[in-house]
Amino acid sequence: MTDDRLYFRQLLAGRDIAVGDMMARQMVNFVYLIGDRASGEAVVVDPAYDPQGILDVLAEDDMTLTGALATHYHPDHVGGDMMGFSITGVAELLELTSVPVHVQDDEGHLVTRVTGVTDANLVRHASGDVVRVGAVDIELIHTPGHTPGSQCFFVDNRLVAGDTLFLEGCGRTDLPGGDPRAMYESITQRLARIPDDAILFPGHLYS
């Protein structure tokens, strides 16, 4: 696969999509689009805040959505109620287009509880599974710590890390399901094989 074939976009909620959404501007979540330009297929990582806006970006780029990937179950990444606000996400996305939602197996029940989607909408994965989009392979790496089923995605020497790893630290471990020991293991062991020259793409603009 050549770099010209890989489709990779980083969208900032509150700026690139969900413009004017107060919650999106406060949480500064990143949404990622990954696909194969040759086949025109793409998946979205953490489609919160503005599903229609995400589809509009894909349409402008002549890409078709074929799936969604969740780094973890928190509403600012997959939709649901948070701090008194209702955030749109995978449930609303599935109302617009029928695609599978890829989740880490340990977190499937949490995604259904938070978003209201059914288990039939989910594809549950183990660490090391690969989601293929055209000729683009995305490796799923289970990285518990922020939540029990947090996962990172590795594609073309790029690590889409969700809330596991940021530019200046790791995700919080003091929320329900957080585990500092698991986070330490995820960073020092599970992600240790990621090349030093890999580019990090975190879940929030925190740095």
Give a label for each model feature.
Residues 25, 34-38, 133-134, 153-157:
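Active-site beta-strand termini and strand-to-loop segments that position acidic
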Residues 27, 39, 50-137:
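Active-site HxH/HxHxD metal-binding segment of metal-dependent hydrolases
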Residues 34, 71, 143:
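Conserved S/T- and glycine-rich ATP-binding loop of Class I adenylate-forming
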Residues 45, 101-105, 161-162, 202:
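Hydrophobic residues in well-ordered beta-strands that form the structural core
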Residues 63, 117, 137-142, 147-207:
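Metallo-beta-lactamase
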